[in-house]
């Protein structure tokens, strides 16, 4: 079993429509959060109209609480306003309030909020990592990583995850804390995010050894959070990247789950904002077309390979996969110092985010177009990649 941060979001199956606004129904077995919802506004709604809508929601919510005298619902919690136009909010509402919201002409759709969590960790001690050598070589079995000395200098990687140990020696002061949307502890008390960050920008384990890393925490110490919190992290990363130069930014999301329109729309908003986004295809050995945000076509979707250049047995597959990257038995940083070995789609994805940062350092340009560049540079070597799936494995073009 591999390792991936897994979101369990909403399906589009049998969506109901009330006065034009879809209330997306949940698939059997989905772990939803009681009375919690994500509301997405119509495309093109103005800031003024969005403010007016939220004021209406807050007024009506307060009136309902006073009128019914029942246990309090929390009301509106998060507000989303991506610079590329996606607007919405999440909150704690009763069914009657949600039905009222769905009747508004300015609402596009509503999803139930859902749990985000990490699957079991596969760990093996004292095993050398092979992923870096494979990225820098056209042949398997190498032990040396060949790369240009620019090494991603000037690029910034946003790691949307469990946080990052920014004091770890691997980052040499290049890692900073960005934002936290899940708890009040600005630290990685799980280890997943630090491992991912090390693969992107660590001095020893990183594909882009001189890149900057920004921690965006959306999952807690148990590797758990919510879709609404993850979307908040995506919005924050997009805005911060645009302030600092989106063409120099990449983002990594080693998380995913069943199809969610809100998750896909948020991922598309990152790409539209000019940020290269690498996302895990999924860790369930199924077609990734039903996974989110992996199924969003404007981002770069990653599957996991083994040291033998075959599909990892846990990796998702399918037409939505853009490239393969090393994901089995990968060594990287762990919180508090030192390293650990983990396997999963979570480990493959940062190889691609790191390669994106590396190419930015080489002056290859940034943004979602980097995915096409990476696919063009990839080598056709993956054995048994899965039905309707690319056999391309990433390569940094070093010529070795």
Curated annotation (Swiss-Prot):
Residue ranges annotated for the Inhibitor I9 domain, each copy included: 36-118
Domain Peptidase S8, residue spans: 129-400
Pfam families: Inhibitor_I9 (PF05922), Peptidase_S8 (PF00082)
Compartments in which it is found: Secreted
EC number: 3.4.21.-
Active site: 161 (charge relay system), 192 (charge relay system), 346 (charge relay system)
GO biological process: proteolysis
Leader sequence segment: 1-20
Annotated propeptide span(s): 21-119
MF (Gene Ontology): serine-type endopeptidase activity
Gene3D superfamilies: Peptidase S8 propeptide/proteinase inhibitor I9, Peptidase S8/S53 domain
InterPro entries, per the entry: PCSK9_ProteinaseK-like, Peptidase_S8/S53_dom, Peptidase_S8/S53_dom_sf, Peptidase_S8_His-AS, Peptidase_S8_subtilisin-like, Peptidase_S8_subtilisin-rel, S8pro/Inhibitor_I9, S8pro/Inhibitor_I9_sf
Chief place of localization: secreted
Keyword tags: Glycoprotein, Hydrolase, Protease, Secreted, Serine protease, Signal, Virulence, Zymogen
PROSITE patterns per the UniProt record, alphabetical: SUBTILASE (PS51892), SUBTILASE_HIS (PS00137)
Family under the similarity heading: Belongs to the peptidase S8 family.
Protein name as catalogued: Subtilisin-like protease 7
């Amino acid at each position: 079993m591999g390792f991936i941060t897994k979101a369990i979001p909403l399906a589009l199956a049998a969506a109901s429509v009330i006065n034009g606004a879809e209330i997306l129904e949940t698939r059997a077995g989905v772990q939803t959060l009681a009375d919690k919802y994500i509301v997405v506004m119509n495309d093109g709604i103005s800031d003024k109209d969005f403010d007016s809508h939220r004021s209406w929601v807050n007024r009506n919510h307060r009136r309902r609480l006073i009128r019914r005298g029942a246990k309090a619902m929390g009301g509106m919690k998060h507000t989303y306003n991506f610079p590329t136009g996606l607007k919405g909010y999440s909150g704690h509402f009763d069914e009657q309030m949600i039905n009222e919201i769905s009747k508004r002409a300015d609402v596009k759709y509503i999803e139930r909020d859902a749990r985000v969590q990490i699957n079991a960790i596969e760990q093996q001690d004292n095993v050398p990592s092979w992923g870096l050598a494979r990225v820098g070589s056209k042949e398997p079995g190498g032990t040396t990583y060949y790369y240009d000395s620019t090494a991603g200098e000037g690029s910034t990687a946003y790691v949307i995850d469990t946080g990052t140990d920014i004091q770890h020696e691997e980052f040499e002061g290049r890692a900073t804390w960005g934002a936290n949307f899940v708890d009040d502890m600005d630290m990685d008390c799980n280890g997943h995010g630090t491992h991912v960050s090390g693969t992107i920008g660590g001095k020893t384990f990183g594909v882009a050894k001189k890149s900057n890393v920004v921690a965006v925490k959306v999952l807690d110490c148990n590797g758990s959070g919510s879709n609404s919190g993850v979307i908040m992290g995506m919005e924050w990363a997009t805005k911060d990247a645009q302030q600092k130069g989106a063409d120099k930014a990449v983002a990594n999301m080693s998380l995913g789950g069943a199809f969610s329109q809100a998750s896909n729309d948020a991922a598309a908003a990152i790409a539209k904002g000019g940020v290269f986004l690498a996302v895990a295809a999924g860790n369930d050995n199924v077609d990734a077309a039903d996974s989110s945000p992996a199924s969003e076509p404007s981002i770069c979707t990653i599957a996991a390979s083994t040291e033998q250049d075959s599909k990892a047995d846990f990796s998702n597959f399918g037409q939505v996969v853009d490239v393969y990257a090393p994901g089995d038995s990968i060594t990287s940083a762990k919180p508090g110092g030192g390293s650990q070995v983990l396997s999963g789609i979570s480990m493959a994805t940062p190889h691609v985010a790191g390669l994106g940062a590396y190419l930015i350092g080489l002056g290859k340009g940034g943004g979602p177009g980097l995915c096409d560049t990476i696919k063009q540079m990839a080598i056709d070597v993956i054995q048994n990649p899965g039905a309707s799936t690319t056999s391309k494995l990433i390569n940094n073009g070093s010529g070795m």
